[in-house]
Amino acid sequence: MSATRYRRFLKLCEEWPKDESKKGRDLGTFLRQRVASAFREGENTQISDPEKCDQMYESLARINSNVYKEKFPRAKDTSFTGVTVEECRLLLATGSMQQTDEEKKGLWKTLMERFSSKPEDVPPEKAEK
């Protein structure tokens, strides 16, 4: 029975879209990692709580097939702030997040990072002293 569960989760992972703009923060990537860790032995993995496993699969399958989007349609594709889906995608992209983190740093910290000598930049004779 665990072989069937394993195959169902693999199929779900194949169907789940990857968002390349969110490197390391993508739900599809996280899901694949969790399935790989939960089914370490592949089809031979013994599942301690089969009911919980089935419930988790059903929940993820409903999300993937947009059951809730169809059940609760929205008049507009905007958030409560009025930001559109495309604007949200741009703001949450990894490049934008890194740029925002850079802007959050103070002037002093930014200057110190740029002009401080790094250990690998120092010649070996000076590093030993």
From Swiss-Prot:
Pfam families given in the database record: UQCC2_CBP6
Boundaries of the annotated transit peptide in chain numbering: 1-13
GO CC, one annotated term: mitochondrial intermembrane space
Record's keyword terms, sorted: Mitochondrion, Mitochondrion nucleoid, Transit peptide
Disulphide-bridged cysteine pairs: none
Keyword Transit peptide belongs to the record: yes
Subcellular location: Mitochondrion matrix, Mitochondrion nucleoid; Mitochondrion
Keyword Amino-acid biosynthesis attached: no
InterPro entries hit by this protein: UQCC2 (IPR037698)
Biological process terms in GO annotation: mitochondrial respiratory chain complex III assembly; positive regulation of mitochondrial translation; regulation of insulin secretion; regulation of oxidative phosphorylation; regulation of skeletal muscle cell differentiation
Purpose of the protein: Required for the assembly of the ubiquinol-cytochrome c reductase complex (mitochondrial respiratory chain complex III or cytochrome b-c1 complex). May play a role in the modulation of respiratory chain activities such as oxygen consumption and ATP production. May be involved in cytochrome b translation and/or stability.
Name this polypeptide is given: Ubiquinol-cytochrome-c reductase complex assembly factor 2
Origin organism lineage: Eukaryota, Metazoa, Chordata, Craniata, Vertebrata
